[in-house]
Every structure is written in C-alpha cells, then in structure tokens.
C-alpha cells in the first residue's frame, strides 16, 4: 500500500464535514469540556441523547489537568466516590471520606466515556452567541473557530440548533453571561470566595435550568448563583454533571 497525502486530507475533511452536518441539529449541546461537562455529556450519551461537546480550546479537561497548583492529583469526597467507580477512575483513600485520584487519568477516563457514549467533540470552537426565536427559548448556538476570535478577524459565524444547552464553561459562566448581557431574564452574580464545604454542599441546588433551554453545571452553576468556589476537590463537579444530565434527559423525555 502506498500512502496518498490527498486521500488523507480527503478522509479528514469528509468525515469531519459529515459530523458537523449531522450535529447542526441535536438534542443537547454541552459547552465546555471540563470535568462537569465531560460527565454530563457522557451520561447524556449513555441515555441515547444526541449530544455534542463544544470546547473553545485545543484540548478538553478544563482545570482538572493541573490538579492543585500543578500537582496532578485531585481529591474526591465520599459522596462522589461512586462516580469514580462508574467511570473506572482509580483512586486511593487518604483520610476518612477523602479519596485521591490522578488528574490525567481522570480526564482521560471521562473523555473516553463520552466518546464511547457517542458524544461528538468540536474543539477549537467558540460559542459567540445564542439563538433565540419567538418563544423566548434558547434554541441554538452561534459558533466560530477559536482562532478567528483570537485573531480578531471579521468572519461571520454559523449556527447549530439544539433543544437544550448546558453551560459548563466554569468560573466564567460564558453562556449565561451572554444571555444576561443581551437582556435575558437572567442575573449572573459571579462566584464568591473559597469555601470548599459550602461550595460542594450547595452545587447540586444550583445545577438547574436558569433560562428557558439553558442549564448550568459545575462551577458555572455556582458562579451564576453567587456561590463559593471549592478548589481542587472535584466531587461536586462530577455530581453536578450527573445532575445536569438528569435534568436535560428529563426535559427531553428520556
């Protein structure tokens, strides 16, 4: 067999073009590929939801890669240990109720779970606006290549339709802030101080539909609510992603 460079190019272009066309209309779009977004997308995919994960950066994983201050370890509390088991993430007990896992393995296992569940990934893709029709509900996303945004080029975007949007953009709560900025009935209070116990204990209450068609998960949920941050303990991120998936699936009737 002789390799042909044009055939390689054609394979990439045709397959990715097919994936993009297929996801111009979908059930759910998860914006942000951190731990909460990955967990949410993986669990939605397992429920048979047609789902894509859109990430503005080259790689997914959010803040999980770096663990705490570049030490590639994360902590998960007892309440979320079952999700480490569910995704096949190895861990060690540290003290009672505290479990330590490798951050790189955690990202890899969550990503693999989402891939295995049929989630389509669109990295290097920035959501610059949302689409709202006459019913006042978010029904789609306005997207462009991240390098276009970084370079400040004047290039019109394209639109992808989705029934449910999940803001998993972390501390910035970017999608929620877009809605707020454009006059939607949504107020983003912004995250509060570091207080791990409070942040972790309240995150499930903040994981909800905050605007018609828009759900928030992970640190985006706490940021919208004005809640505290938690640092490198990730149980709340996983539990919030699970809860967001349940809410979206319920809304979709799955």
Swiss-Prot record:
The coenzyme or cofactor needed here is: Fe(2+)
Q: Which reaction does it catalyse?
A: hydrogen sulfide + glycine + NAD(+) = ADP-5-ethyl-4-methylthiazole-2-carboxylate + nicotinamide + 3 H2O + H(+)
Query: Which residues are involved in binding NAD(+)?
Result: 36, 55-56, 63, 127, 154-156, 219
Which Pfam families does the annotation name? Thi4 (PF01946)
Record: residues binding glycine: 229
**InterPro entries the UniProt entry points to:** FAD/NAD-bd_sf, Thi4_fam, Thi4_prok
What is the uppermost EC class here? transferase
Q: What are the alphabetically sorted keywords of the record?
A: Iron, Metal-binding, NAD, Thiamine biosynthesis, Transferase
* Gene Ontology molecular functions: iron ion binding; pentosyltransferase activity
Show the disulfide pairing. none
EC numbers on record:
2.4.2.59
Pathway(s) served:
Cofactor biosynthesis; thiamine diphosphate biosynthesis
GO:BP terms for this protein? thiamine biosynthetic process; thiamine diphosphate biosynthetic process; thiazole biosynthetic process
> What SUPFAM superfamilies does UniProt report for this protein, alphabetically?
FAD/NAD(P)-binding domain (SSF51905)
Write out the residues that bind Fe cation: 156, 171
* Similarity comment: Belongs to the THI4 family.
Extract the HAMAP family matched here. Thi4
* Subunit text: Homooctamer; tetramer of dimers.
Its function, per the record, reads: Involved in the biosynthesis of the thiazole moiety of thiamine. Catalyzes the conversion of NAD and glycine to adenosine diphosphate 5-(2-hydroxyethyl)-4-methylthiazole-2-carboxylate (ADT), an adenylated thiazole intermediate, using free sulfide as a source of sulfur.
Q: What is this protein called?
A: Thiamine thiazole synthase
């Amino acid at each position: 067999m002789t390799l042909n460079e044009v055939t390689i190019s054609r394979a990439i272009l045709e397959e990715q073009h097919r994936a993009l066309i297929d996801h111009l209309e979908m059930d759910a779009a998860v914006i942000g590929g951190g731990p909460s977004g990955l967990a949410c997308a993986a669990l939605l995919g397992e429920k048979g939801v047609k789902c894509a994960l859109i990430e503005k950066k080259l790689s997914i994983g959010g803040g999980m890669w770096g663990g705490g201050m570049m030490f590639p370890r994360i902590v998960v509390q007892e309440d979320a240990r079952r999700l480490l088991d569910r995704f096949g993430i190895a861990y060690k007990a540290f003290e009672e109720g505290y479990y330590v896992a490798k951050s790189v393995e955690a990202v890899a296992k969550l990503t693999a779970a989402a891939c295995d569940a049929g989630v389509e990934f669109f990295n290097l893709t920035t959501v610059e606006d949302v689409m709202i029709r006459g019913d006042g509900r978010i029904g789609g996303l306005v997207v462009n290549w991240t390098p276009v945004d970084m370079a400040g080029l004047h290039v019109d975007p394209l639109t992808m339709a989705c029934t449910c949007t999940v803001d998993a953009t972390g501390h910035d709560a970017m999608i929620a802030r877009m809605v707020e900025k454009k006059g939607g009935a949504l107020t983003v209070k912004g995250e509060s101080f570091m207080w791990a116990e409070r942040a972790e204990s309240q995150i499930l209450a903040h994981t909800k539909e905050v605007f018609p068609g828009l759900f928030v998960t992970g640190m985006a949920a706490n940021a919208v609510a004005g809640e505290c941050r938690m640092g490198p303990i990730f149980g709340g991120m996983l539990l919030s992603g699970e809860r967001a998936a349940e809410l979206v699936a319920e809304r979709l009737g799955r």
